[in-house]
Amino acid sequence: MASGVTVNDEVIKVFNEMKVRKSSTPEEIKKRKKAVLFCLSPDKKEIIVEETKQILVGDIGEAVPDPYRTFVNLLPLDDCRYGLYDATYETKESKKEDLVFIFWAPDNAPLKSKMIYASSKDAIKKKFTGIKHEWQVNGLDDIKDRCTLADKLGGNVVVSLEGVPLK
């Protein structure tokens, strides 16, 4: 069921910037987004970038020691969101980076919000061409353990996520 919600051009721009890894200067790399959340506009007619809910590659280290944990902490406990997370992980063979589309619909979000976000999900997914991994998350228990994301990325072949070895 389509909701009639549109996707703001800035959302598509952010996705394309995260998807395309062109050779960049160190300064440009620091400004690249590692993770970003998208929400519905106040009038519920458009999916927009949630400007204050993002992690830049340049922040990783001192300001953001663990980007995965920081991303989880950006998620609101009482409302839905869409997210893009640029996962850096290692398999037994090689290092990899993949974008993960996350539909966050916590159990205690208002029913109306869950319905609008669920029915608008296809609108944003259609704009995110080439995404290999999609994950619907319904609560912190589903997302707080990085092993769950590792399973989505490649099951038992993933040995570390964001430089942290998996147990």
Curated annotation (Swiss-Prot):
Location in the cell: Nucleus matrix; Cytoplasm, Cytoskeleton
CDD domains: ADF_cofilin_like
Record flagged with keyword Cytoplasm: yes
Gene Ontology terms for molecular function: actin filament binding
Residue interval(s) of motif Nuclear localization signal: 30-34
Domain named ADF-H: residues: 4-153
Pfam families in the record: Cofilin_ADF
Superkingdom to which the source organism belongs: Eukaryota
Main location: nucleus
Any single biological process term in GO: actin filament depolymerization
GO cellular component: actin cytoskeleton; cytoplasm; nuclear matrix
Matching SMART domains: ADF
Keyword terms of this UniProt record: Actin-binding, Cytoplasm, Cytoskeleton, Nucleus
Keyword Nucleus: yes
InterPro entries xrefs: ADF-H, ADF-H/Gelsolin-like_dom_sf, ADF/Cofilin
Family: Belongs to the actin-binding proteins ADF family.
Role played: Controls reversibly actin polymerization and depolymerization in a pH-sensitive manner. It has the ability to bind G- and F-actin in a 1:1 ratio of cofilin to actin. It is the major component of intranuclear and cytoplasmic actin rods.
Name this polypeptide is given: Cofilin-2
Originating species: Xenopus tropicalis (Western clawed frog)
Gene: cfl2
